[in-house]
Every structure is written in structure tokens, then in C-alpha cells.
Amino acid sequence: ESVADLEESDTRRVPKIPLHLVIAGCPSLKTFYQGDIRHWHQLFDAACHVRPAMGISVSAWEEAQRCMGPEQASIVVVAMLERFSDIRSPGGYLRALTSKAAAGEFSCGPMVMALIGRRSAA
């Protein structure tokens, strides 16, 4: 890979959605993670904390981080937590989204906006 390829992949991985919107769309996270979340690394810590309880394997989590970047993978996991009762196989769902991300066909922004839309409609 060239430097340009690496820079392009890095910018593609930076979440295009503000952290405060992620937190607003995923209030269930506060039930399972007591720490403050003001920075992306804190969201990553929270996702690492809830991942095992959701039944997501280490290998699925690591692959998601590799394909999406740690921030977007974290967003996906905490968004999945919000809809946990609707997801039959969280590990399988994360792997499917990881495959889409690897093909350039997935962005976590619409996932979070859908959660916010559900909350405002409720």
C-alpha cells in the first residue's frame, strides 16, 4: 500500500457522526457502562466492556476493528446494544456488517440516525 492508500483508508475510518449523537442514540449504554464517554477512546472502552456480555467473540470484534477502525466498530457494537433484543445473533450480525464495511458498503452513521429517529418517534 502507498502512503496515499493508507491516508485514504484512515480518513474513511474516522466516524462522520459526532460522538454526542452516538451517545444520544444509544442510551442503554449507560445501564451497562458507568464511566463517562466524552472521547472516542472512552466509547471504545465501553464497547470492549459490553461486547462479551452480548456474545460477540473476540475474533468477530477484532475483524470489525480491522475493517472499520476501532471507533466505527465501537459505534456498531453500542448501536447493536440498543437493539439487542431484536438481534438473534449479535456475533453474526457484526460479521455481516464487517463484510459490508470491507467492501465499502457500510457506514455507521445511518445506523445511529435510525436509532435517534426511533427514539424521537416513540
Task: For every predicted segment, state its role.
Residues 1-122:
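Electrostatic interaction modules used in gene-expression and signaling proteins
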